[in-house]
Amino acid sequence: LGQNRGKEYPREITRTMIEKFSEMGTLPSVIYMEGGGADDKVCYDMCNEKDIKVMQWNCGDFWPEFMHENYPDKDYKEMPMVKNIYNPDEVHYFGDFTHKDALSVLKKIHGERIRWGLRGGMVDFTELVPIDTKFDNGLMGNRMHNFWVWWYAKAYHDLYTEMTGGDYLCYMRGACAGSQKWNCTWTGDQMNSFDGLKQQIVGGLSLSASGFSIWGTDMGGLSEKPEDEVYIRAYQFCTFMPIMRTGGDATKLPWDYGEKVQEVFKKFYWLRENLLDMIYSYAIYSHKTGIPMTQAMALAFPECKEAAGNEEQYVFCDNILFASVFEKADTKNVYFPAGRWYSLFNDEVIE
């Protein structure tokens, strides 16, 4: 839940975040580092001391300067970089993850940080492969546009599996058939508004119905600070997602918002903590069976005509009915399929 995107004073930012979360009694399981903190071992040490995992931003670029520095005896033709169809000496920055040496490059880029305690993170920019390129597996860019994501995801899976024994989490914004075997997904850059939240529930349920069960969002939007009410509804929404995480350029730290936000943050933080065993167990079940962690109403209740087309409710982990409030309102009409429903927050029962 924590964010540290600061390029300056990363140690001070990390220390302050840990102290303030501790004061609230809501210590996060992960702090996301981007900027100076991602390369500072002291920041990792502070997190490790509190048993907080560190994640970072990743992209698929292999920079020529880095490649020449680390592979001085090789020319571009031999490097795991995407080549121009007409001139193999002309390379794009995109890593060629079909190449046998791609994993060794990732180890050089990320290996030291993984040894410090890095445990995955965002794997970004998965949809930009140029058409006029050729890969080591012989396929051209027009055929690899989607499939590159599969190789990209597998490369990071192989990297972290080998170096951490499987104790990691990576999530991508791109996907293709089969890439969910290697990584999770997040629904991409979103607006910091109620409309942005509505887009995420549609995107997440579409992902789930397509076989991508484990997903999350940039809580509260990518850019600029959301209004307090949007933050609250986004946080409640994320509580009932497979992956609960913050993200984006603007702060999502609760103390940067009003008192009501902080109270809601604490309440739903502990609700999530108490649901974790169920969520973890159902994630394993979902991975083995293909049954989504978030089921659209039509999928969960195919016999109910009233459920069809309902895009603002879903069933989470097979037994929690979640109904979003994605507008400035305190109440919402909720459709309850036949059965007995118990409130999570009081002793109310609906039949």
Report residues per predicted region.
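Catalytic-domain carbohydrate-binding cleft regions of carbohydrate-active enzymes
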Residues: L1-E351
